[in-house]
Amino acid sequence: MPVTMSRRAYAGMFGPTTGDKIRLADTELLIEVERDFTIYGEEVKFGGGKVIRDGMGQSQRSRAEGAVDTLITNVVILDHTGVVKADVGLKDGRIAAIGKGGNPDIQPGVTITIGPGTEIIAGEGKILTAGGVDTHIHFIAPQQIEEALCSGVTTMLGGGSGPAEGTKATTCTSGPWHMMRMMQAAESLPMNIGFFGKGNASKPAALIEMVEAGACGLKLHEDWGTTPAAIDCCLSVCDALDVQATLHSDTLNESGFVETTIAAFKGRTIHAFHTEGAGGGHAPDIIKVVGEQNVLPSSTNPTRPFTRNTLDEHLDMLMVCHHLDPHIAEDIAFAESRIRKETIAAEDILHDLGALSMFSSDSQAMGRVGEVVIRCWQTADKMKRQRGALPEDISGNDNFRARRYIAKYTINPAIAHGISHVVGSVEPGKLADLVLWSPAFFGVKPDLVLKGGSIAYALMGDANASIPTPQPVHYRPMFASFGRSLIESSLIFVSAVSIERGVGARYGLSRPLEAVRGTRGSISKKSMILNDATPVMEVDPETYEVRADGELLTCEPADVLPMAQRYFLF
């Protein structure tokens, strides 16, 4: 017999549906459900007296007959593709289907079969996103992995070998021996990981050696000498072996200016780190590369968004990270040349225009590994407050802006580094690296973090309590963070040539290796989903004012941010 429910009652029972709006944390951003794949009156829900019971919402079908391993019920998916409500089926550690879960023997429209072997994760009233992809990691301390996971990041690409001075300043795992040791260490970490070799060399042999040893990319860093010759050599090796090149250019303009570096690219694809420049790069105008079709530009999170405290914290941070001496005038001048309020303000707007394509952390090296997601949404909120709704958001929601910003730390870095075939979005066939959020805590504190379809980290109460919720509730490792489950639930991203050369067996690795692919001529700025703008960039060398297509880009620093202190009282 049909029953009519109010929207409020329906949302309370089954979560929001088409036309309902959801506020993201304490921001001014509202997303609206565009489509609901579930069927009214046929929704499935787990619990006493609920639908998913034998002969009701649960069929008799075995796993071999098509039942999924896990079903996330009635969840709102926020992805670069849109905002939809659906059931999400997981099987073999992958996303199997997005649609309508249930018992196909008695329910209409079922596209995902629930069987006796199906586990249920309740998604009612929750938001599901893809795990974040952080492509600027200094692997200084293994404790970064826990911080990143608890923020919603499930893939980390970068370089280093621990708290050595080279690693504290540059994202490079230098040489085959360190590459081997870091890949062996990654076996015990519940995170997808890939390592960049050092890209600074004028002859190719040593660079080829590192890629053959397992590097999934090469990093050019000014502290090792990012000269035109090194850039050209590095890009040539990357083109030959299909790995991405990443750039931290010459702040001091010793070997040339930004135009010299652009010329050295010769139109070849490169990922430009901290493109604004406070994190490093040609002073004061590295931001010009935003307008180049072959440059994939990203930000690191210390300058995100521009606040009244941004400039003050950067000087000391920079001195430590780059091994500078506060008693040497030239070192002070070097540091001060990188910190400019004008370019940092412009960075906010370039993100909102979709001209800056990606977010990353720069972990412990002028960046906070657990704040990629937070800083991204804080920037989106600041831009809505200062610039209003985007032209594409004409329906009273912020769906387009939300899609643009989530793409910056999910699908776009995955595309840039040749791993979008397995991670970066909530799509069938991809690794089930998923993050479940309560809307009030969206972007700040996830409820669950899944790795390869299993729960790796979660908010969990006292383990000696009679139920899971008594205090103290904090993040704790779950079963996918232990034993063989840990090994099988995550990947190490490597070059294809290293797999051909058998590095897994040579290093004694048990974890699956996944080759990066399609990182070179097949991608460009046009590949950056919802973030592919290439404005003509100008920077005044005296005032540092930034213009895009002739328009001055400036905004005020924020005094107050959402997703901040009220969420971290304890």
Curated annotation (Swiss-Prot):
Catalytic activity: urea + 2 H2O + H(+) = hydrogencarbonate + 2 NH4(+)
Domain of life: Bacteria
Residues that bind Ni(2+) 2: K219, H248, H274
Cofactor note as given: Binds 2 nickel ions per subunit.
Changes after translation: Carboxylation allows a single lysine to coordinate two nickel ions.
Single GO BP term: urea catabolic process
InterPro entries in the cross-refs: Amidohydro-rel, Metal-dep_hydrolase_composite, Metal_Hydrolase, Urease_alpha_N_dom, Urease_alpha_subunit, Urease_AS, Urease_asu, Urease_asu_c
Listed Pfam families: Amidohydro_1 (PF01979), Urease_alpha (PF00449)
Presence of keyword Repeat: no
Active site: H322
PTM annotation (N6-carboxylysine): residues: K219
Major location category of this protein: cytoplasm
List of residues binding Ni(2+) 1: H136, H138, K219, D362
Binding site for substrate: H221
GO terms under cellular component: cytoplasm
Cofactor: Ni cation
Subcellular location: Cytoplasm
E.C. numbers: 3.5.1.5
Annotated GO MF terms: nickel cation binding; urease activity
Subunit structure: Heterotrimer of UreA (gamma), UreB (beta) and UreC (alpha) subunits. Three heterotrimers associate to form the active enzyme.
PANTHER family in the cross-refs: UREASE
Family statement: Belongs to the metallo-dependent hydrolases superfamily. Urease alpha subunit family.
HAMAP family the UniProt entry points to: Urease_alpha
Name of the protein: Urease subunit alpha
Origin species: Methylocella silvestris (strain DSM 15510 / CIP 108128 / LMG 27833 / NCIMB 13906 / BL2)
High-level lineage: Bacteria, Pseudomonadati, Pseudomonadota, Alphaproteobacteria, Hyphomicrobiales
Gene from which the chain derives: ureC
